[in-house]
């Protein structure tokens, strides 16, 4: 979901717009192209994330459990690899100069954070659809724009 995308952006090192060197990526993930190690894998050499990130969700359960069947594991692995701390079943209580006060499993706890990014819900906004229909323009309304909620890429592809 959007929280995973934002967390991945936040842990990324600043970029000059150039693709990352292949050797760096291979070392980070422990890929041995020389096949000098069994299975072509060596000990990963993770890079240091640009910042410490918490990924919190109100829904009970592990964050990312509802990510896509074919690629969700990659997103979860990437955030774990970058030491993103993930909690589900979180109740948000307060944001102030001390950070973010949350409650998890009945226990309150302060997270010392400098910034809070809220990635919460969406509501369909169909005013443009109505005006385009009035002008007899052809359009397609698919995915999260058609039905707000959990994004389902397969559904969006089928729809348009």
Predicted regions and their residues:
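A Rossmann-like FAD-binding core segment of flavoenzymes
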Residues: 6-127
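Ferredoxin-type iron-sulfur electron-transfer modules and their immediate structural context
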Residues: 122, 130-131, 154
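A residue-level detector for conformationally permissive "hinge/kink" positions
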Residues: 98, 113, 135-136, 152
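A conserved FAD-binding loop/helix module that cradles the flavin
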Residues: 2-8, 46, 64-72, 139-160
């Amino acid at each position: 979901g959007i929280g995973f995308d934002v967390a991945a952006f936040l842990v990324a090192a600043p970029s000059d717009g150039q693709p990352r060197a292949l050797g760096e990526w291979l070392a980070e993930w422990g890929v041995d192209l020389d096949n000098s190690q069994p299975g072509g894998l060596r000990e990963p050499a993770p890079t240091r994330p640009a910042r410490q990130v918490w990924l919190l969700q109100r829904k009970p359960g592990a964050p990312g459990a509802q990510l896509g069947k074919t690629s969700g594991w990659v997103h979860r692995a990437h955030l774990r690899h970058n030491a993103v701390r993930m909690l589900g079943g979180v109740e948000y209580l307060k944001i102030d100069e001390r950070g973010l006060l949350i409650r998890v499993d009945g226990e309150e706890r302060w997270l010392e954070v400098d910034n809070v990014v809220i990635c919460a819900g969406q509501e369909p906004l169909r005013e443009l659809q109505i005006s385009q229909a009035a002008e007899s323009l052809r359009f397609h309304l698919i995915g999260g724009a058609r039905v707000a909620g959990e994004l389902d890429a397969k559904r969006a592809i089928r729809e348009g």
